[in-house]
């Protein structure tokens, strides 16, 4: 019986991919653990700018390499999986690999925008304080 993820019968909808995946496979459990660790690093690196930049660059690089990872996984799926999940369109790897990484990257960008807004607000407050101190000297 061919797998539901074979290239000729690959499901078009995202719910079909999610429901037809055997989430108990060790490599998928490991991938889920990897995504949890990435999320934890995203959350705990908010005070360390260089670490967060490095983490962001790693996330973006992994997403960029997803097509190549998909090709290698499609050729060698029997070594680590019970089913052929990797199709030519990259739907499965996009859902289980790239999407969580992109969400982490989005969280980092939101944190950077928030930090930038806080700095801009602080800068404006400091300018207003400086102007307020300069006014009594002029009068």
From Swiss-Prot:
GO terms for biological process: cell migration. Pfam families: TMEM18. A motif (Nuclear localization signal) lies at residues 130-138. GO terms for cellular component: cytoplasm; nuclear membrane. It is a multi-pass membrane protein. The keyword Isomerase does not apply. This is Transmembrane protein 18. Keywords: Coiled coil, Cytoplasm, DNA-binding, Membrane, Nucleus, Transcription, Transmembrane, Transmembrane helix.
